Amino acid sequence: MIRSYFVPVCILAFLGCLSSASSSRAQEPNRPQQPMVYEGTVGGLRVIEEGQPAVMIHATVEDMKRFRQGNPNARPGSVQPASTSNDLYYHGGAGGIGVETAPKIYLVLWGSQWNNNDPSGEAAILENFYRGVGGSSWLNSVTQYCQGVATGTFTCGNSGTHAGNQTGIFAGVWADNASSAPSKPRQSQLAAEAVRAAAHFGNTTASSNASVQYVIATSTGNNSSGFKTQYCAYHSSTSSSYGNVAYTNLPYITDAGANCGANFNGLGPDAGITIVGGHEMGETITDQFPSTGWLDSGGAENGDKCAWISSGQGASADISLSTGTFAVQSLWSNAFNSGSGGCVLTYP
């Protein structure tokens, strides 16, 4: 498949029934646990490094496939009893922050390994995607989620402060290539690079990082341990003198081949780059400091619930932005299907 890009000038549990008559519900722990459908917990919260905050992992294609094969109720299109709900609900936030109300995305190309070493052109693809995605109908489903509401809230309505989807959410790129990145960077090293990026971009206060995410992208062959076998990417946060800093570990996605999206759904060899990059971006906007934002009762975020769907409602597809054509997965919308919830490629 031929894909078009504009070169820049200079990256579980589901489908239930939600009552449309109520704007919020009691906290989830007080509700009886019900059979979960549509996805499951193959992705979600994991401890990657002792002493570090847990991360939200993006499951691989094969892990998701095996999970769905072993859990008939977790397959797309499954039906569950009307008494259950697998929609996202608010987990209270951290320091009053649960979503990114005016998102800013910074791309960090970490390490001298990037120098003349980008065989798939991932840097340009990511930059073009981030430059064009703000304000798109694909990302707009994040705007139904909010902060400043009670823990356990399912529907914001006009309450709280909603997540944003403004144009121009891409705030800059930093080629941090003066020295090499660790050959297999640990989570603590990735977190430290995110803090360095905050300083580089002048975000040195808690307020300046309150709606910001840093995508730490590593070059080919320079990926963290567990990539392509345990996960495709993950996002987390770290505390610093600049406040809490949200970041994504984005390895060189095409190194994983089909297990992280190459040719997924016939979308081309580079499809996984923006499927995974978009997944992490959408999750960070709605759960900036995991897992205090919007998740379901199984601990899945809006991207986890819709990962690697190949047919039917929510199947991954190409979208057209002003900066090119890019493959994306769908994102979970509580509002879909009159409040029953589901995976959507456009909103409203």
Model features per residue range: what roles?
Residues 104-109, 138-148, 155-157, 168-172, ...:
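Structural recognition of the beta-strand scaffold that forms the well-ordered cores
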Residues 20-92, 100, 110, 134-140:
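N-terminal zymogen propeptides
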Residues 8-19:
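Bacterial N-terminal signal peptides
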Residues 156-238:
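Active-site-proximal segments of metallohydrolase catalytic domains
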